């Protein structure tokens, strides 16, 4: 039995689909059962647990031989990093109580760094705390998700401009489809044989991209020319808040992109276990037609 935390997220759902395709039993651990109907239709058992309740989470994963842990981030929480650290504590208590044979945790590029990485820093804490549990552990560090750029579809559609926190615009950086993260996780979950603990694996897409590539892809999806422009550092936090992020989260994102632009967010030095997903950034699954249509300005929808 595989227990999947964060089952309703993009990566969690992709892991579950792969496991069910291969005939494995899956228990989907969710906070809101109403969002798990499609998972139930796939044949999953559904367990409901609050990620701040260690006893409830332990009950949800009890009996599972293998657990996939995904620690969510709350962009509008007053203290997003503190909230995530609290959830990490809950997850670790549940794992110690239930002692599954194998745990895979989805982490983040740059998680080896202990300072200066903004919203990636809680993943450093996640990895450190999981190591203390003594469980057989695989750390799957994910590059930036391609799907995250959908947040800028509306801005690009309305203005013809892609404001970029990646500086310079020509700088190549790793990205990966959330679906490919889930597929890589499923492969690792079912792998057998002896392995080092923790096993460290990085996952990114088939190649690296620049902000110029992103603008070109958004332009093709939207049917108009999109120009990438470096957003001045002094404007980052205000722009992120206008985009719907809480002030604390916006500050953490800004610090992360400072680290990105300094070349710090990458495969850990000396690491060799790198999985490359097959999905290109221009794949229709990244920006489905319905998502693109919803981002179009009202005038273009009516026309």
Predicted regions and their residues:
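Oxidoreductase cofactor-interface core, primarily capturing Rossmann-like NAD(P)-dependent enzymes
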Residues: 1-27, 31-41, 52-55, 59-62, ...
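A general structural signal marking secondary-structure boundaries and capping sites
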Residues: 192-193, 260, 295
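Amphipathic terminal alpha-helices
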Residues: 271-303
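Terminal hydrophobic/aromatic helix or amphipathic segment near a protein terminus
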Residues: 201, 215-262, 299-303
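Aromatic "clamp/platform" in nucleotide-sugar-dependent glycosyltransferases that forms part
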Residues: 83-88
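Cofactor-binding loops of NAD(P)H-dependent oxidoreductases
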Residues: 49
